[in-house]
Amino acid sequence: MNRRVARLRAVQTLYQLTLIDINVDKAIENTLNDEEEPSEFYNTLVHGTLEHQDEIDGYLSENLKGYTLDRLGHVDRAIARMGLFEMLYLDDIPVNVTLNEAIELAKAFGGTDAGRFINGVLSNSYDMAMKNK
Protein backbone atom coordinates (compact mmCIF):
# COMPACT_ATOMS: atom_id res chain seq x y z
CA MET A 1 0.00 0.00 0.00
CA ASN A 2 1.67 3.22 -1.12
CA ARG A 3 1.21 6.47 0.79
CA ARG A 4 -1.43 7.89 -1.54
CA VAL A 5 -3.59 4.77 -1.14
CA ALA A 6 -2.92 4.77 2.62
CA ARG A 7 -4.20 8.35 2.86
CA LEU A 8 -7.32 7.50 0.86
CA ARG A 9 -8.04 4.43 3.00
CA ALA A 10 -7.38 6.42 6.19
CA VAL A 11 -9.90 9.07 5.13
CA GLN A 12 -12.42 6.33 4.36
CA THR A 13 -11.84 4.80 7.80
CA LEU A 14 -12.11 8.13 9.62
CA TYR A 15 -15.23 8.97 7.61
CA GLN A 16 -16.86 5.72 8.74
CA LEU A 17 -16.05 6.47 12.35
CA THR A 18 -17.91 9.79 12.15
CA LEU A 19 -21.03 8.15 10.73
CA ILE A 20 -21.33 4.80 12.47
CA ASP A 21 -20.86 3.86 16.11
CA ILE A 22 -18.21 1.17 15.59
CA ASN A 23 -14.73 0.61 16.94
CA VAL A 24 -11.66 1.47 14.93
CA ASP A 25 -10.72 -2.16 14.23
CA LYS A 26 -14.12 -2.83 12.65
CA ALA A 27 -13.85 0.38 10.59
CA ILE A 28 -10.42 -0.73 9.35
CA GLU A 29 -11.79 -4.16 8.47
CA ASN A 30 -14.68 -2.54 6.58
CA THR A 31 -12.35 -0.21 4.68
CA LEU A 32 -9.62 -2.50 3.45
CA ASN A 33 -10.09 -4.93 0.59
CA ASP A 34 -9.61 -8.60 1.42
CA GLU A 35 -6.18 -8.66 -0.21
CA GLU A 36 -5.03 -5.34 1.31
CA GLU A 37 -2.77 -5.32 4.32
CA PRO A 38 -2.72 -2.12 6.37
CA SER A 39 0.63 -0.39 6.08
CA GLU A 40 2.40 1.14 9.05
CA PHE A 41 1.73 4.56 7.52
CA TYR A 42 -2.01 3.84 7.25
CA ASN A 43 -2.15 2.67 10.87
CA THR A 44 -0.24 5.75 12.00
CA LEU A 45 -2.64 8.06 10.15
CA VAL A 46 -5.78 6.43 11.54
CA HIS A 47 -4.67 5.89 15.12
CA GLY A 48 -2.69 9.13 15.36
CA THR A 49 -5.56 11.23 14.04
CA LEU A 50 -7.91 9.64 16.56
CA GLU A 51 -5.41 10.01 19.41
CA HIS A 52 -4.91 13.74 18.73
CA GLN A 53 -8.44 14.49 17.53
CA ASP A 54 -9.36 16.91 20.33
CA GLU A 55 -6.27 19.06 19.74
CA ILE A 56 -6.71 18.90 15.96
CA ASP A 57 -10.39 19.80 16.23
CA GLY A 58 -9.48 22.82 18.34
CA TYR A 59 -7.18 24.21 15.65
CA LEU A 60 -9.63 23.40 12.86
CA SER A 61 -12.56 24.98 14.72
CA GLU A 62 -10.63 28.22 15.16
CA ASN A 63 -10.05 28.41 11.40
CA LEU A 64 -13.45 27.47 10.00
CA LYS A 65 -14.68 30.87 8.92
CA GLY A 66 -18.47 30.86 9.16
CA TYR A 67 -18.65 27.14 9.95
CA THR A 68 -18.58 24.88 12.94
CA LEU A 69 -16.80 21.55 12.84
CA ASP A 70 -20.16 19.77 13.12
CA ARG A 71 -21.45 21.64 10.07
CA LEU A 72 -18.45 20.63 8.00
CA GLY A 73 -19.11 17.70 5.67
CA HIS A 74 -18.00 14.33 6.98
CA VAL A 75 -15.51 13.74 4.16
CA ASP A 76 -13.98 17.22 4.45
CA ARG A 77 -13.75 16.78 8.22
CA ALA A 78 -11.94 13.45 7.83
CA ILE A 79 -9.52 14.92 5.27
CA ALA A 80 -8.83 18.01 7.41
CA ARG A 81 -8.27 16.00 10.59
CA MET A 82 -5.95 13.52 8.92
CA GLY A 83 -4.08 16.22 7.00
CA LEU A 84 -3.47 18.34 10.08
CA PHE A 85 -2.35 15.29 12.06
CA GLU A 86 0.16 14.45 9.35
CA MET A 87 1.39 18.06 9.15
CA LEU A 88 1.86 18.36 12.91
CA TYR A 89 3.14 14.93 13.88
CA LEU A 90 4.86 13.26 10.93
CA ASP A 91 8.08 15.22 10.64
CA ASP A 92 9.54 13.01 7.90
CA ILE A 93 6.94 14.25 5.40
CA PRO A 94 7.26 17.83 4.11
CA VAL A 95 4.27 19.97 5.04
CA ASN A 96 3.73 21.06 1.43
CA VAL A 97 3.51 17.40 0.32
CA THR A 98 0.87 16.64 2.96
CA LEU A 99 -1.05 19.80 2.09
CA ASN A 100 -1.04 18.94 -1.61
CA GLU A 101 -2.20 15.37 -0.93
CA ALA A 102 -5.06 16.63 1.26
CA ILE A 103 -6.09 19.13 -1.42
CA GLU A 104 -6.08 16.40 -4.07
CA LEU A 105 -8.22 14.13 -1.87
CA ALA A 106 -10.68 16.96 -1.26
CA LYS A 107 -10.88 17.75 -4.98
CA ALA A 108 -11.44 14.07 -5.79
CA PHE A 109 -14.35 13.85 -3.36
CA GLY A 110 -15.80 17.35 -3.59
CA GLY A 111 -14.36 19.25 -6.53
CA THR A 112 -12.16 22.32 -6.88
CA ASP A 113 -13.96 24.36 -4.24
CA ALA A 114 -13.45 21.60 -1.66
CA GLY A 115 -9.74 21.62 -2.49
CA ARG A 116 -9.52 25.38 -1.95
CA PHE A 117 -11.44 25.10 1.30
CA ILE A 118 -9.15 22.37 2.67
CA ASN A 119 -6.10 24.38 1.57
CA GLY A 120 -7.22 27.43 3.54
CA VAL A 121 -8.32 25.57 6.65
CA LEU A 122 -5.20 23.39 6.84
CA SER A 123 -2.78 26.24 6.09
CA ASN A 124 -4.29 28.50 8.73
CA SER A 125 -4.63 25.70 11.30
CA TYR A 126 -1.02 24.63 10.79
CA ASP A 127 0.23 28.21 11.12
CA MET A 128 -1.76 28.64 14.35
CA ALA A 129 -0.40 25.38 15.77
CA MET A 130 3.18 26.39 14.97
CA LYS A 131 2.72 29.73 16.74
CA ASN A 132 1.45 27.90 19.83
CA LYS A 133 4.43 25.52 20.05
From Swiss-Prot:
One record GO biological process: DNA-templated transcription termination
Gene Ontology molecular function: RNA binding
Cellular-component GO terms for this entry: cytosol
Top-level taxon: Bacteria
InterPro entries: NusB-like_sf, NusB_fam, NusB_RsmB_TIM44
The keyword ATP-binding is annotated on this UniProt entry: no
This protein's UniProt keywords: RNA-binding, Transcription, Transcription antitermination, Transcription regulation
Any matching Pfam family: NusB
Stated family: Belongs to the NusB family.
Function (record text): Involved in transcription antitermination. Required for transcription of ribosomal RNA (rRNA) genes. Binds specifically to the boxA antiterminator sequence of the ribosomal RNA (rrn) operons.
NCBIfam families hit by this protein: nusB
PANTHER family for the chain: ANTITERMINATION NUSB DOMAIN-CONTAINING PROTEIN, N UTILIZATION SUBSTANCE PROTEIN B-RELATED
Name of the protein in its database record: Transcription antitermination protein NusB
Organism: Shouchella clausii (strain KSM-K16) (Alkalihalobacillus clausii)
Gene: nusB
